[in-house]
Swiss-Prot record:
Orotate binds at residue 124. Pathway: Pyrimidine metabolism; UMP biosynthesis via de novo pathway; UMP from orotate: step 1/2. InterPro entries: OPRT, Or_phspho_trans_dom, PRibTrfase_dom, PRTase-like. Belongs to the purine/pyrimidine phosphoribosyltransferase family. PyrE subfamily. The gene is pyrE. This is Orotate phosphoribosyltransferase. Keywords: Glycosyltransferase, Magnesium, Pyrimidine biosynthesis, Transferase. GO terms for molecular function: magnesium ion binding; orotate phosphoribosyltransferase activity. It comes from the Bacteria. It comes from Staphylococcus aureus (strain Mu50 / ATCC 700699). The lineage of its organism: Bacteria, Bacillati, Bacillota, Bacilli, Bacillales.
Length: 203
């Protein structure tokens, strides 16, 4: 599954690699990889495979789940697909409270006293996941864990989740992606070294 998802992300250019002309993330980090999983929404077969893969992770690791929660904004559609298939209540979590109306940070299903799984599109440092998890816990939820489409495999993310003692699982990761990209002839052996060094240095 990990390699199939990685291949799909590369094929539809949800993930692009540019070892010799670095991207600039919103955080200012220079990176040879750019991931925009919102692209998957335009490909029914890919988004369906992602939905089913995430459902399998949930059934394997969090079978007692009662509410599906998406992180705003990219996690929301995948959470909706999953909740619909599993016939479960769903909500989503903003990065901060609204400035108007009821000023809610969580919209949708009530979380209090419920076992919740958080849906992310991408895990980089884990920061957005922690924001969502903390908001849900403050609302009285029992957060079981996080599932996501892809992770860069940064040590910082491992540390982030370890610090809040919460498990996370992903459909694919950086190592699988690099291997698939090499097998597909999209990158050279020199590119691989650049990609690995970037990840290790950032970690």
């Amino acid at each position: 599954m990990a390699k199939e998802i990685a291949k799909s992300l590369l094929d539809i250019e949800a993930v692009t690699l540019s070892p010799n002309d670095l991207y600039t993330w919103s955080s200012g980090i220079k990176s040879p990889i750019y991931c925009d999983n919102r692209v998957t929404l335009g490909y029914p077969l890919v988004r369906g495979a992602i939905r089913d893969g995430l459902i399998n992770l949930i059934k394997e690791h969090f079978p007692e789940v009662e509410v599906i929660s998406g992180t705003a904004t990219a996690g929301i559609p995948h959470a909706a697909f999953i909740a619909e298939k599993l016939k479960l209540p769903m909500n989503y979590v903003r990065s901060s409270n609204k400035s108007h109306g009821k000023q809610n940070q969580i919209e949708g299903a009530k979380s209090e006293g419920k076992k919740v799984v958080v849906i992310e599109d991408l895990i980089s440092t884990g920061g957005s996941s922690v924001t969502a998890v903390e908001a849900l816990k403050q609302a009285g939820a029992e957060v079981l864990g996080v599932v996501a489409i892809f992770t860069y495999g940064l040590k910082k993310a491992d540390d982030t989740f370890s610090n809040i003692q919460l498990p996370f699982y992903t459909l694919s990761d950086y190592n699988e992606l690099i291997e698939v990209a090499e097998n597909e002839g999209k990158i050279s052996s020199e590119d691989i070294q650049t990609l690995v060094e970037w990840r290790d240095n950032l970690a």
